[in-house]
Structures are given as structure tokens and as C-alpha cells.
């Protein structure tokens, strides 16, 4: 009986409870923030305008970087083409034997110190790792010489113990043969090898570069191969004049061949870097232009919607005043 009375009283009180006004709760936001939340269109317009300004600044930077890369490419390209005449006679004389089987191989990986140049650095790293797998074995040793900050950063992750020498900031100053020959001399003094395999990007055009491997054999391997015969067997047909022995002559030829091949490889890789950076910056500039067009369209639509809303509010207010009269 008591429960029935309680239920009746509850039903009688329920409408009055539901109709009670909800107490006002002060917002934790400041007046400016509340104003901003209510004015969504004005905020979105400002955000789009700021975004457009950022994209314009980025587009200016990418265009400037493209022009700088084009200027550097013109300066290096002619020297790279001229340097091809240095190593070609040595390749004709001593050969280029990428498939030769030796016990000690050293892979010289050439990369850039700076980024924003497409996939030239990842490409030479992939080729270097493939050479490591091909030449590694139970009685074989493969080591790395890294030239450039980008390849160094990638190779240090999983091949740190196999890196015997790393060189950075080679392109800080204009490249010349004396600078590269000092680098080649350091490699020859600090690294024991039977074959040096130089991995670099050969320049073809602004949008095309070819990963290339050039092989330089040690004097001992050259002499051994010349005794066996084949292409290197033709070395015995040359008459040696002066007091130098065949081993000393081969030593000098191998060292000079390595420095010439390195000089050409460094210049070819520098051309590929500048060409790839030109292409990347041109693509970035075009993408920024397309993004700017979309943002301009969004800004105009948002602004038009805001103006339309304000006009509707003005007309509605005027109509209400007319009706009140």
C-alpha cells in the first residue's frame, strides 16, 4: 500500500521535476574563446589565409632551391663530361671486371651530404647491400667505405661493424682532382683489398641517372690475372723500359686508375644529386601551386558563405522590424 502511494506521488512530482530550469553553468573558456567558437566562419577564413601564406613561402623556397641546383649543375656537368677521358684509357688497359671472384672486397658507396634530392642515396645503398650479399662468404670478407652523410646514416644502422672508413662534407668546396686524389690515397693506405667496387649514380639527364659499379683491382690480382691470360694477359706484350719492375708499374697504374675513377664517380654523383634536386624542387613548386589554387578556392567559398550569412541576417532583422510595425 505504501509503495503504491509512493509511486503515485512520484508520477505527480515527475512533470514538475522535468520542467525545472537547468542552472546556468559558467563556461571555462574566456570571452574571446567563446566568441571564436561561435564565429566558426571567421576563424576558418583566417586559418585558410594563414595556410595560403605558408604555402606561398614554401613555394618561394623550392623555386630558389631549384635555381641554385640548376646553377651548380651547369658548373659541374662540363667537368664531369671531361673527366670521363681520364679513366677510360685505364679501363681499356686494365679492364673492369665486376664479376671477378676475390677474397677481400671493399665497396665504396658515394652519396650526398644533403637531402631533398629524390632517391639517389637510397639507390646506391641498395646496390651496395646487394654487392655485399653477392661477395660475402665463409672465406670472403666484404667491407664498406662510405662517402656522404646520407649513406652513412643509413648504413650505420645495420652494417656499422663492416664500415672501415667514412668521409663527409666532400662537396663542401668545389671538387678538384687534388682533393679526390687525397681521398683515394687515404683509402688505399687504410684499407686492404683485392677489389674496390665503387658505387655511384652516373648522370644522364636532369631526370635520369643510372646506378653504376666500377671495379678497380689490386696490383697483385692484376698480375695474377695477367699470368692466367684473358684480357689482362695482353699486359705481358708491353715492353717495360727503365728500372721499374712489372709489380711497381702495376702498383702505380692501379693507384692512378683508382684516383681517376673516383674523380669521375664523385663528379657524376654530384651531377645526379643536383639534377635530382632540380626535379624534386620543380615537382614541389608545382604541388605548392596546385595546393594554393585549392586553398584560394576554399577561401573564396568560405568568404562567400560568410557574406551570404551576414546578408541573410540583415534581411531577416529588417523583415522582423517591418513586421513589428
UniProtKB/Swiss-Prot annotation:
It comes from Arabidopsis thaliana (Mouse-ear cress). It holds the Pfam family ATP-synt. CDD domains: F1-ATPase_gamma (cd12151). The gene is ATPC. Belongs to the ATPase gamma chain family. Mitochondrial membrane ATP synthase (F(1)F(0) ATP synthase or Complex V) produces ATP from ADP in the presence of a proton gradient across the membrane which is generated by electron transport complexes of the respiratory chain. F-type ATPases consist of two structural domains, F(1) - containing the extramembraneous catalytic core, and F(0) - containing the membrane proton channel, linked together by a central stalk and a peripheral stalk. During catalysis, ATP synthesis in the catalytic domain of F(1) is coupled via a rotary mechanism of the central stalk subunits to proton translocation. Keywords: ATP synthesis, CF(1), Hydrogen ion transport, Ion transport, Membrane, Mitochondrion, Mitochondrion inner membrane, Transit peptide, Transport. Coiled coil: none annotated. One of its GO terms (cellular component) is proton-transporting ATP synthase complex. The keyword 4Fe-4S does not apply. This is ATP synthase subunit gamma, mitochondrial. It is found in: Mitochondrion; Mitochondrion inner membrane. One of its GO terms (molecular function) is proton-transporting ATP synthase activity, rotational mechanism.
Amino acid at each position: 500500500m505504501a509503495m503504491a502511494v509512493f509511486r503515485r506521488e512520484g508520477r505527480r512530482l515527475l512533470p514538475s521535476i522535468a520542467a525545472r530550469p537547468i542552472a546556468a553553468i559558467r563556461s571555462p573558456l574566456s570571452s574571446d574563446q567563446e566568441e571564436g567558437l561561435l564565429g566558426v566562419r571567421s576563424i576558418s577564413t583566417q586559418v585558410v589565409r594563414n595556410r595560403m601564406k605558408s604555402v606561398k613561402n614554401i613555394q618561394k623556397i623550392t623555386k630558389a632551391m631549384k635555381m641554385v641546383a640548376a646553377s651548380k649543375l651547369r658548373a659541374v656537368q662540363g667537368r664531369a663530361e671531361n673527366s670521363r677521358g681520364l679513366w677510360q684509357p685505364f679501363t681499356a688497359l686494365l679492364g673492369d671486371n665486376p664479376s671477378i671472384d676475390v677474397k677481400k672486397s671493399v665497396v665504396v658507396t658515394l652519396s650526398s651530404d644533403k637531402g631533398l634530392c629524390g632517391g639517389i642515396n637510397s639507390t646506391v645503398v641498395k646496390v651496395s647491400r646487394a654487392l655485399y650479399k653477392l661477395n660475402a662468404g665463409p672465406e670472403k670478407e666484404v667491407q664498406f667505405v662510405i662517402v656522404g652523410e646520407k649513406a652513412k646514416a643509413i648504413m650505420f644502422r645495420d652494417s656499422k661493424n663492416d664500415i672501415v672508413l667514412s668521409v663527409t662534407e666532400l662537396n663542401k668546396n668545389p671538387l678538384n682532382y687534388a682533393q679526390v686524389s687525397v681521398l683515394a690515397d687515404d683509402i688505399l693506405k687504410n684499407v686492404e683489398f683485392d677489389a674496390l667496387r665503387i658505387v655511384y649514380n652516373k648522370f644522364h639527364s636532369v631526370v635520369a641517372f643510372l646506378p653504376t659499379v666500377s671495379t678497380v683491382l689490386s696490383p697483385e690480382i692484376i698480375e695474377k690475372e695477367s699470368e692466367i691470360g684473358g684480357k689482362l694477359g695482353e699486359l705481358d706484350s708491353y715492353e717495360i723500359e727503365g728500372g721499374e719492375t712489372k709489380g711497381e708499374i702495376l702498383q702505380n697504374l692501379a693507384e692512378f686508375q683508382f684516383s681517376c675513377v673516383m674523380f669521375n664517380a664523385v663528379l657524376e654523383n654530384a651531377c645526379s644529386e643536383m639534377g635530382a634536386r632540380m626535379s624534386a624542387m620543380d615537382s614541389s613548386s608545382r604541388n605548392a601551386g596546385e595546393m594554393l589554387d585549392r586553398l584560394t578556392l576554399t577561401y573564396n567559398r568560405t568568404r562567400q558563405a560568410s557574406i551570404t550569412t551576414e546578408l541573410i541576417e540583415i534581411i531577416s532583422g529588417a523583415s522582423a522590424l517591418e513586421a513589428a510595425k
